[in-house]
Structure formats: structure tokens, C-alpha cells
Amino acid sequence: MHAILFGATGMIGQGLLRELLLDPGVQRVLVVVRRPTGVSHPKLSEIVHADFYDFSSIAAQLSGYDACFFCLGVTSLGKSEAEYRRLTYDLTLAAATTLAPLNPKMAFLYVSGTGTDSSERGRTMWARVKGATENALLRLFPNACMIRPGYIQPMHGVQSPSKGTRRAYAIVGVAYPLLRALFPKSVTNTEELSRAMIRAARGEAPKKILEPADLIALGSVLKS
């Protein structure tokens, strides 16, 4: 697999990058970032790009890939619907519409979230916007897959870029084994989620929209 990763410096992206580099079936990983990851690996190449609404200047470097993992996302708290849509729908589609003609058979995996509203008509703003984004990607890529995780526990030194979020995970992490036991179909971790996403990119997912239980089932299968 030759893969492109957006969002490599975020918590989910960090975990996914780790698993992509460890996976012997992944030969090449390109990360597109606003700031360097600081990660060095023979399989890894990196493009530092400032404008995530316009990829025309680097488009020539984005062809020849089998999969794209799009892990960028922001909270909707404190944002108007117009602002959140620009940071979610518009930003994602800027990358997707650049990649689609270059890699028409690409598997495009988008990290959304459980509770996303596919009807786009619900009362919850973030869920409507995420739903619109998912629907646009499903129309654009025949091999698109939507990733809707629930609670995710960071593993293997993975950390959220946000200091407040890191503190919250440090507190909740103490109870992670209990949460996992109580909610086995809702609580996952960065390693398991990443394995599920890689398998989905290889066409092993049972459907195009994967909820928490689907991701846990797919990610917990032992490697053959």
C-alpha cells in the first residue's frame, strides 16, 4: 500500500502513522502537514504545506497512491455553523477534490465521529456538517469509507496536541481498562482504531460507514 495521511500531528494521526510505518504491507507513507512531524523513517516522506484549501502547487506529488487517511478535525465548540463548515467540509473537500482525479481508485478514509447525521437535517450542528462531508466523499470516491469512532484512548506515547485534552486523557486513562470492560463496543484505543482503518483501506471493511463496534471488531482481529 502507498498511503497519504493528513493530520499526522493530531492524536489519531500520530497513532495511525505509527501503525502504517510498522505494517509490512505498507510500502510508502506520505504525510501532508502544516508543521513538520519530527518523525524519520525509510518509508516516510513529508510535505509541509501552508494552505490546506489549495493543493494545486503540490498536486503533482499526490498521484500514485492507493489510500488516503484524512484525520484532520476541529471541535465545533465556540464556532458558528459557517465557520465550522469551512474548517470541516470545505477543508476536507479541498483535499478530496484534488486527489480524486489523480487517484480515482483510491480508498479515502475520513475520520468523522459517532453520532454523525447522514440526513444532514438534524438539530445538532456538528453532526449535520460531518454528515454533509461524509456524503460528499461517498459520492466522490467509489472506495470511500467513513470512520466513526467513539471514545479513543491514546497508546504508545501518542498525545493530543491540546494541553487540556492531554490532561483529560491522563485522568480518564486510569479508568480505561474499566471503561473498556463496561463498554466493549464503544471504547477503543489508537492502536486498535489504526489497525481497523488500515484494514478498511485494504477493502476488508464490511460496509462504508463504520461505527465504534465495527471499528473495534475490525481492529481487534489478529494479523494473519
Please place each PLM-identified region on the residue numbering.
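Residues at the starts of beta-strands that form the adenosine-phosphate
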Residues: H2, G25-R28, K105-A107, N143
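N-terminal Rossmann NAD(P)H-binding glycine-rich loop of SDR-like oxidoreductase domains
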Residues: H2-D23
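NAD(P)H-binding glycine-rich loop region in Rossmannoid oxidoreductase-like domains
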Residues: A3, G38, S45-A94, T98-P101, ...
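Oxidoreductase cofactor-interface core, primarily capturing Rossmann-like NAD(P)-dependent enzymes
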Residues: L22-Q27, P42, S118-L222
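NAD(P)-binding Rossmann-fold cofactor-contacting core
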Residues: V29-V39
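Hydrophobic/aromatic beta-strand patches that form the interior of the parallel beta-sheet core
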Residues: L30-V32, I47, F69, L109, ...
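Conserved Rossmann-fold NAD(P)-dependent oxidoreductase catalytic core, especially the SDR/UDP-sugar
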Residues: V33-R35, V74, A82, R86-A132, ...
